[in-house]
Every structure is written in C-alpha cells, then in structure tokens.
Amino acid sequence: RPSISGHVPLQAGFFILDAYGLKPKGTPDWRSLDNQAWIGRPPAAVTVSGAQHVSFDRCRIEHTAASGLDFVDAVQDSTVEGCRFNDIGLNGLVAGEFAGGGFESHLPWNPADERTICARLKFTNNLLTDCATEDWGGVALIAGIVRDTTIAHNEIDGTSYTGISLGWSWTRSANASRGNLIHANLIRNFATRVSDTGGIYTLSAQPGTVVSENAVLHPIISPYVHDPEHWYYLYTDEGSSLITVRDNWSPEKRFLQNANGPGNQWENNGPQVSEKIKAAAGLEPAFQDLLKQ
C-alpha cells in the first residue's frame, strides 16, 4: 500500500496490492500478457457509494493530495455540473469500477448484481485544471467500468498524464461497460510529466460508446520522459471495441489504435473537422464564468 516510501501504481494511481508473473503467459484476451495485478483504490476528498439522484452543482474542490471527487460504486442517475477542480494531487473526477476487491485487473468485470454498476451519470460543464500534481500518473477525468454515462462540455487545462480516460481491464471480452458518451470536451496541455498517453484514452469493449466532437489541443511534453514521442490526441488502447470515434478536432491526425478489438468506427477526425465543432467544445456559455475564477 502507499506509504512514506511510495507505491507502485498500475495506472491512474490505482496502486498494486499484489502481483505475479504468468507461466505460461497469456489470457484468452491477451496472449502475450505475462503479469497479473490486484489493486487498491486511491482516496479522494469526496467519495460517493450506493447512492442515486445525487447532484454536485457549482462546487469547488482544490488543493488535494489525492483525487478530488469519486463515485465509487452503485451510484446511478447522478450529476456533476459546473464544478471547479483545481490543483488536484491525483485524479480530478473519478467514477466506476476498476476491478478492485480481490478481482484481477485484466479480467472482464461483470457483476452478478448489476445494481453495483455506476450508471446513467452526467459529468458536464466542469473545469479541471492542474490535475495529477502529486501522483503524475493521474487523469483529469476518469471513468472505469460505467454504463450509459455522459462526459460532455468539460474543459481540461493542465494534467500530468491523460485528459479523459474511459474503460478498464485491457480486455475485448464483454464486460459491464456500454452506452457511454464523450462529447464536445476541450482538452489542452495534457501529458505535462508522463508519456504513453492521449488527450482522450479508452480501454476494453464498450458497445454503443461514442467519442464525438471533442477538441484536443497540443500537449506539453516533458523533456525527461522515457519516450517523448509516445503520445496521441486520441488513443484507443488494449481491447477497445465497439466504439465510434467521429468528428473530433485535433491539430493533426496523430492517433493510436493499439491492440483493439472488433467493431470500432473512426470517422472524420483531425484538423479538417469543422471549426464550429472546435469552437463549441468545452464549457457552454452559461458556465463560462468558471474561467474567471
């Protein structure tokens, strides 16, 4: 566990409790996988579990050592809107399952009781700045295994690693995640300290999920990362499947589709996307006042 001596993270600050090598290596989804890991969930300033119809409206969370706000499990029909996250030590806004509780991280998560799934969440018109200032592997806005969740019109400016991350488990097999939407977000100044990242990043099978009309601007690449070229505006990683990625603006077509599963559709992404789409990304007019705080 984390201590004064530090900790070993798997990804996004989720720390390894136990791990071992696979002999022979490989799983049905990932033939070359040679390790397994069991993880713990980092703390947050505010956590929510087993709740429905919860709203965070115009709240401010800042100067944290770990994460900001975390919808941990069994949270449904809830919203975070018009909130300000600033100077966050780890992940700014977190939601969903990340294969904890003794479940191995690389296996598809399908709970017997679907009431435990975080579902029908809306994260809209939030401003997230200077995230992952203490644990550099953090993400400004990260949703693990969630269902029918909308991440829209948020603005992210400054994060050590990834802007928005959706999915978990590194598997193309069916899991509980589906029907999610990442739409019209504005992301700039990501990857300030860590590479192998994307402005928007996905993992695993997510039937019916759409990534659309986002604007991802240039990162700020640290001069001392191990591979300063290993970053992308859009990054569908291990097992990403059944996801539609369309009409996203970026300065160039720098995208990565790494070990994806079937059924992904990429349509009209890059600098040729309409300037109207680029201009509409980020905070809507009623929430522009957040930029002045």
What are these regions (language model features)?
Residues V48, F71, A95, L128, ...:
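Hydrophobic side chains in beta-strands
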